Regions:
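A structural signal for the principal folded core domain
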Residues: 1-217
Length: 217
């Protein structure tokens, strides 16, 4: 690490949302991939092709982070197709996943735009309840430990206080603009990239970022 952390609040007791706004795009993909990973676990390796075939017929392609998950567009497609999960999981096992994803979809409509819907609190609370019901179902019925990822944690614990303070939806704090710059940055970084174990790795990364930024002026 060649630069200190940029986030160093004087008061460590302040709400995390006052320092880092909830990342709208990553929350969306995080919740959906949480469900996606659970579906994969429920089906098992021997039924992986069943999931892939079900996905292909619904325009879902696995090409997310490190090639194991769903990116933004495919997350939306999986969210839309989740109503059909009973086809591969059965009605009983699919029900709590479908319920959670349906309620998350309502949350995105209520909270992820610039303006909050009047009943956003009720919609968000209903989603939070569905998360705990899914965790409980996995533990009791499936004997699966469904861990809470940091994105699920943010969605359950930190989004509501942030929205109550700002009285606005998450759109104005979306990281999507920065995400869309990945390709342009990648072109510059390819010229200077070093293996992470190379002693010049950090220096070259900083140089690449500086060169890219200087070209934007």
């Amino acid at each position: 690490m060649i630069r200190p952390c940029l986030i160093n609040p004087d008061d460590l007791n302040i709400p995390i949302g006052d320092v880092i706004p909830p990342p709208q795009l990553h929350l969306h993909t995080g919740i959906v991939n949480w469900a996606w990973d659970l579906v994969k676990k429920m089906l098992g390796e021997d039924q992986h092709n069943v999931l892939l075939n079900w996905s292909r017929t619904r325009s879902i392609t696995v090409r997310g982070y490190q090639g194991t998950g769903l990116d933004g567009g495919n997350s939306k497609n999986f969210l839309k197709a989740s109503k059909d999960l009973h086809i591969i999981l059965g009605e009983k096992n699919a029900a709590p996943i479908k319920d959670m994803l349906h309620k998350f979809d309502l949350v995105t409509k209520a909270c992820f735009s610039r303006d909050l819907l009047p009943d956003w609190r009720m919609i968000l609370d209903s989603f939070v309840t569905s998360v705990w019901e899914l965790v409980s179902f996995c533990k009791i019925e499936l004997k699966i430990k469904l861990s809470i990822t940091w994105k699920v944690h943010i969605m359950v614990c930190h989004v509501r206080p942030f929205l109550e303070k700002t009285n606005m939806g998450l759109a104005d704090w979306s990281e999507q603009t920065g995400e869309s710059a990945h390709h342009k940055v990648e072109v510059e970084m390819k010229r200077l990239r070093r293996d992470i174990n190379n002693p010049l790795h950090g220096e070259k990364m900083l140089s690449g970022c500086s060169r890219f930024n200087s070209k934007q002026f």
